[in-house]
Amino acid sequence: MTWAQQRRFAGHWFPEVELVPTDGLVETLRQTKDEGEIARMTAAAAMADAALAAVRHRLGESPTEAEIALELEWQMRRLGADGPSFQTIVASGPNAAMPHHRAGGRRITEGDPVVIDFGAQLEGYRSDMTRTVVVGEPTETLARMYDVVLAAQQAGVEAVRAGVAVAAVDEACRSVIREAGWEEAFLHSTGHGIGLDVHEAPRVSASADATLADGHVVTVEPGVYLPEHGGVRIEDTVVVTSDGCRTLTRAPKDRDL
């Protein structure tokens, strides 16, 4: 319902009640997921895992980015998903250096890094996962990029725990990339909440003033992007617990095809 509709009908529906606008109340309530919500997101993540397993081998057959995106979405629907969480990202070669590239007509070729960022939607709830695969032999720089991003992502996941500031999770990832000399090539925040929307509170970044709590569901997705080499991003969706977190997205993080 729009604000104009609410104003038009409020007097008829609730003549004795004053409706007071709120700012952030619903968004705050939505941060903590109950068991039913987490169950849907767990199932959605499993569908995305299975879809990637079914399609991954196709990367070596010189498909276009758009063909891989279409096949992933078809596989998720075949497995019972209502559809993709968002427009599937398949970014190959130089396109991998653009964090939000959309799948296009470029053919995936030998030596390409391929960044695949996608998820399944089930009964309104979403998953989000990124894997990077190298087709053929990586260059020395690309291999190092992968190792650094994987280490950063693992450090970020290990930092997730109820009571931890989101900025501390961001720093856990960012410090690994900073030590490698690529801090300026980490072009975005470390993650975000996810649920009914693919991006919701809490935002996992250096500037965010929020603390993780039991039942929050967030992503951890560091990346390094170098135009002359492509890009690497690795992402998981995790459920925050009192003693750490539980990873929902479980597809292997193997670099090589």
Where are these regions (language model features)?
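Active-site neighborhoods and metal-handling regions in enzymes and metal-associated proteins
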Residues: 1-257
